[in-house]
């Protein structure tokens, strides 16, 4: 009887371990592509506080890049995407580069450029200038879809830009 209980405990532990790994995104068999998404918006400091914090406008054609490095800090992948009319961008990144598995935590996403005539100064809100690493856990993990949803990156007008220290 004790042996049966012990075997059931071992089996349950193994099943829980497999479920846990899949939940945190460390083991997803068959996934060849990871998806990255976020928004690019314009934030105008000349507006009132309420409009400034909640009245940001989407930037169509705002360019965002992803740079991934290997374990020796060499760049192994670079791509960019432009935002749509609503400011959304979505990139698909191959999970295997030159036969090696890409580690999402080694990828950095940042602002590149804005086509907007007046709202084209990148800000570091949500890491737009310095870049942001992908989170440890994907936002969406469903069947063969692995997606990392990043925050909103912001551009601002030249009038709002902080002068460089000199």
Could you say what each language-model-derived stretch is?
Residues 113-161:
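C2-type phospholipid-binding modules
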Residues 25, 29, 156-166:
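Extracellular/luminal ectodomains of metazoan preproproteins built from arrays
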Residues 2-131:
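Beta-strand-dominated extracellular/periplasmic modules and repeats
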């Amino acid at each position: 009887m004790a042996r049966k209980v012990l075997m059931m405990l071992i089996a349950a532990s193994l099943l829980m371990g497999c479920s846990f790994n899949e939940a945190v995104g460390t083991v997803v068999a068959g996934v060849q592509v990871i998806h990255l998404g976020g928004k690019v918006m314009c934030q105008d400091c000349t507006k009132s506080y309420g409009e400034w914090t909640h009245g940001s406008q989407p930037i169509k054609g705002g360019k965002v890049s992803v740079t991934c490095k290997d374990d020796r800090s060499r760049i192994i992948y670079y791509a960019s995407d432009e935002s749509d009319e609503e400011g959304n961008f979505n990139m698909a990144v191959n999970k295997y580069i030159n036969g090696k598995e890409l580690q999402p935590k080694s990828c950095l996403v940042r602002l590149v450029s804005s086509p907007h005539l007046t709202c084209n100064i990148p800000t570091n809100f949500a890491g737009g200038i310095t870049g942001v690493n992908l989170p440890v856990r994907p936002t969406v993990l469903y069947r063969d879809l692995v997606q990392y949803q990043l925050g909103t990156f912001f551009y601002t007008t030249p009038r709002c830009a902080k002068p460089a220290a000199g």
